[in-house]
Amino acid sequence: MLSRQTMSNWVLRVAEDWLKPVYEELHGRLLQRQVLHADETTLQVLKLEGRTARSKCYMWLYRTSGDAEHPIVLYEYQPTRKAENAAAFLEGFSGWLHADGYAGYHRLPENIRVVGCWAHLRRKFDEAVNALPKEQRVGCAALEGLEYCNALFGIEQELAGLPPEERYEQRCLLYTSPSP
């Protein structure tokens, strides 16, 4: 029977020898794109040198946009949420970064233009509407924003099955035409 340590060493060796080069190749290809998405979420780590048990760490996600012929999604573990983590990962990238409202993204170099996420904005409108008493919801600005986001998401859902070029053309027609 193999020991747990032996099996663990095998997994680490395979990751280092075989998976790391694949990850690095995908990372290089990701940085060549014009539009990326980024997000980070907490991850509880039971034991980490120099930190208390059950410390909060972060899993960062970076991915290509929906128009990519070959989508790439990469995860990066980091012990902190410092903006330097994103800056280091995105070194060499120049383009649009689609992200939530985390201030760290706005400290990235000028060649990375941060744009907001409609899903996060919609959630904030929804939270604002639900925080109001029901009688104050009708006609409030938060409800107007929520309805706008819902309409926008409806259009995007209709366009989802189209090839990227056709989606772009349809968006140009829909979003630049005057409102009725």
Predicted feature locations:
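Conserved small/polar residues in nucleotide/adenosyl-binding loops
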Residues: 175-180
